[in-house]
Amino acid sequence: QRQMCIRDRASAASNAGILGLIGAGSMYPEVLREHIQKCKKATNRPFGVNVPMLYPNINDIMDIIVEEEVKIVFTSAGNPKTWTTWLKEKGITVVHVVSSLKFALKAQEAGVDAIVAEGFEAGGHNGRDETTTLTLIPIVKEQIKIPLIAAGGIATGRAMLATMVLGADGVQIGSRFVASEESSAHIAFKNAVVKAKEGDTQLTLKELAPVRLIKNDFFNQVQELYKKSPTIEDLKNLLGRARAKKGMFDGDLVEGELEIGQISGLIHDIKPVSHIVKDIIDEFEMSKNQAGNMNF
């Protein structure tokens, strides 16, 4: 299995007709610059950068995004007021990721162009409130006026149609593309995602940064520590540094952090991004036609 980097998955997604995103995460600024430059060479279609705002080098990250003329930025894990106006003044479209109506309204007030409302089912870092996508989307739709993108528990055309019936204007899909040939994830982690069933993930570490993980040995260590009424420092000491890299990119399925969504129970294979996109769109169209033919 050939391992490709983050930019390959983003450019493959854009080339397949959807918006590919480069996840800046805890990436060093100059590494992000390299990914952006190579992504631009790999596709002439739009792509964006996803920027969690909790990292200390956020100023350098944003400067590079502007210097490299990225046109779309998804922000998360921070106050949207901090960067939205500055980015929009540079001609950049800003989308903010939220897990509740409260933060959706704050993002709209901050002037973002669209909102991603992400339900509790989503993999990786999430909100502390256990609000499902099924509940969150219509609640947010009822009170915001800007475009709404659904996320969390979406890996099929059926789920895409369902969220759009609930009021979403589009969808953001993460977990399904982890199990793609272009994904930078380690093959051992990809295989663990394919193997995972419903109930094999759980949201934990809510006192730090809530995260949905596959229940492996590291997850079990966290649960054992919770039985001892740990302090925040106890949890930080157990988590350590680079735990996610160890699990998802180095392939340590025992001690690593394995971030994936509940929808892993519907991920059965590893295939090219273009095939995944085609499957989702084909199923979406088929499901839409079936729904139109229903007799109630």
PLM segments and residue spans:
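A glycine-/small-polar-enriched, mobile loop at the entrance of the PLP active site in fold-type I
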Residues: 17-30, 45
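Short glycine-rich, polar/acidic loop-and-turn segments at beta strand-coil junctions
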Residues: 24-26, 51-55, 79
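Conserved active-site-proximal phosphate/metal-binding subdomains
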Residues: 127-149, 155-296
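Short catalytic-loop micro-motif centered on adjacent basic/acidic residues
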Residues: 21-23, 48-49, 73-75, 149-150
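Short, small-residue-biased leader/transition segments that mark boundaries at the very start
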Residues: 2-6
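Alpha/beta enzyme core
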Residues: 7-16, 34, 38-42, 55-149, ...
